[in-house]
Amino acid sequence: MFSFFKNRKDSNMKLIVGLGNLGREYVNTRHNAGFYVVEKLAYELGEDITERKYKGLFAKARIGNEKAILLEPQTYMNNSGESVRAFMDYFKIEAKDVIVVYDDINLEPGNLRIRLKGSAGGHNGIKSLIAHMGTSDFPRVKMGVGEKPARMDLADHVLGHFNAEDKKKLDEAASHAIEAIKLMVDGQYDTAMNKYNVKKTK
């Protein structure tokens, strides 16, 4: 394994962040879709997200020819920016080299959407990132988890678990998200968006 800590300043280093909540009760909930994708990516790369630093669990990896850090902030969703900012500062990573994966209620399960910048769209984890990073100009991969049913509280919806059908759709979308992340790490943002920003029918 290459050394990250001998030379923290590396213009090619990427920070891939999955957003979610820590705790067994949140595993496989809609709000933890970001954790799910990053953990699946780590598994594919033969890495474990087990190292601790700056309020986060992380793994060091290589994606293609690029160095990358896979990060799961352990601050709970609403304070995710604290951990991300600390990693950016320590490793001298710019916002454009941070790729954030998170849940989006405006997309149906099975869909994903890649954006290079944008508002928080009501997502508290992204609000925290924007506040601590000082910019909204960072790439993100949004994972569809579906709109909340009528008369259901939003928190209950996003903290709820996927049913079997939607979990299957998430698995497929997660595989596509991983391929998209690989393209993005390689600088092929347009290719990733053209290939994966396709709406799937229910």
Language model segments and positions:
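Nucleotide and nucleotide-moiety/phosphate-recognizing core
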Residues: 2-117, 127, 131, 135-141, ...
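Hydrophobic alpha-helical segments within soluble ligand-binding/sensing domains
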Residues: 122-125
